[in-house]
């Protein structure tokens, strides 16, 4: 059973479902974990409504970390919608997300490759402080961030 809490909208709930499906398909030898155990996904600040597909890659990475026992490298932040085939798809609000990452002290941010043109809208002082890494697939992301 999958439980989802944190005042999430329908699109974000779908992102959790897609993340679970992707992880099951990428780690078939671990699929029985989902049959034998419940999964509870909570996105903090429970009273604040959250929605949209941008956390898809982050949710997928978190669930892959749980299943594999590999930690996520703390130097990374990431944003991107994911498809059921594992493609990292573009998101909106990239300048604001990169500014927030920089303010939080993050050094590396994974973004959808299809959002590279949006970097023109990002302030130079933000870009100078971040290593911005375009990615196309879930596999690329997991190879970079799971240790």
Label every PLM stretch briefly.
Residues 1-147:
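Peripheral, non-AAA+ core regions of ATP-driven protein-machinery
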């Amino acid at each position: 059973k999958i439980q989802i809490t944190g005042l999430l909208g329908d699109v974000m709930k779908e992102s959790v479902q897609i993340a679970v499906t992707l992880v099951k398909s990428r780690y078939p030898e671990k699929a029985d974990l989902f049959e034998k155990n419940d999964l509870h996904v909570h996105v903090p600040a429970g009273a604040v409504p959250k929605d949209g597909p941008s956390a898809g890659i982050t949710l997928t990475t978190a669930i892959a970390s749980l299943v594999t026992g590999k930690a996520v490298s703390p130097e990374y932040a990431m944003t991107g919608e994911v498809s059921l085939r594992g493609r990292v798809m573009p998101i909106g609000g990239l300048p604001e997300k990169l500014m927030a990452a920089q303010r939080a002290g993050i050094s590396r941010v994974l973004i959808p490759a299809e959002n590279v043109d949006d970097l023109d809208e990002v302030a130079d002082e933000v870009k100078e402080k971040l290593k911005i890494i375009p990615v196309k697939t879930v596999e690329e992301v997991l190879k970079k961030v799971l240790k």
